From Swiss-Prot:
UniProt entry tagged with the keyword Transport: yes
Disulfide bonds: none
UniProt keyword annotations, A-Z: Coiled coil, Cytoplasm, Endosome, Membrane, Protein transport, Transport
Record localization: Cytoplasm, Cytosol; Endosome membrane
Subunit relationships: Probable peripherally associated component of the endosomal sorting required for transport complex III (ESCRT-III).
GO cellular component terms, A-Z: cytosol; endosome membrane; multivesicular body
Gene3D superfamilies for the chain: 6.10.250.1710, ESAT-6-like (1.10.287.1060)
Protein name in UniProt: Charged multivesicular body protein 5
Organism placement in taxonomy: Eukaryota, Metazoa, Chordata, Craniata, Vertebrata
Function comment: Probable peripherally associated component of the endosomal sorting required for transport complex III (ESCRT-III) which is involved in multivesicular bodies (MVBs) formation and sorting of endosomal cargo proteins into MVBs. MVBs contain intraluminal vesicles (ILVs) that are generated by invagination and scission from the limiting membrane of the endosome and mostly are delivered to lysosomes enabling degradation of membrane proteins, such as stimulated growth factor receptors, lysosomal enzymes and lipids.
Major subcellular site: cytoplasm
Biological process annotations from GO: late endosome to vacuole transport via multivesicular body sorting pathway; protein transport; vesicle budding from membrane
Amino acid sequence: MNRIFGKSKPKVPPPTLTDCITNVDGRAESIEKKISRLDAELIKYKDQMKKMREGPSKNMVKQKALRVLKQKRMYEQQRDNLNQQSFNMEQANYTIQTLKDTKTTVDAMKVGAKEMKKAYKQVKIDQIEDLQDQLEDMMENANEIQEALSRSYGTPEIDEDDLEAELDALGDELLLDDDTSYLDEAASAPAIPEGVPNDSKNKDGVLVDEFGLPQIPAT
């Protein structure tokens, strides 16, 4: 059948805005290069005219410069038009992409809302309240157990008057213990003599014994 009717050609996808922008930008860059070459020619003609005298030759160079300048103006107009087209397509492309992003965001929010509804269905408020009540009861039971364990047994009753009397007596005993008069007596006792008994010195300051002879130092 393909031999008789021929095989259909695959459909070529239409160009996107991005493709069109790339194409237009490429054309604008090509025109910009042409403008740069014309600028170089204009500079060359201008330098020639500065060195030439007035006359037919200078007029001929001037006419060439005017033609080049005219071409430059045309190219500049084309470049500006292409740049404007590229800008418009970029704005349209930006708007389209923004709408796509918005749709994606809305779809994600819808999915999130569905998931939240499912999660809320699995959570029972009554079960949470029952759980809170159970926890509160267990805490009360734990407190009662602690109070029971800390209960004291066989503790005699103590008279407050007896405690105050004992406290007053304890204060007197502490005052007696704080008496430091014995320290004063120890401080007034005669000092311990220093040096060796019966030591004396002659007029030259040499230590002598009881017979007045110089002492031999011990080695």
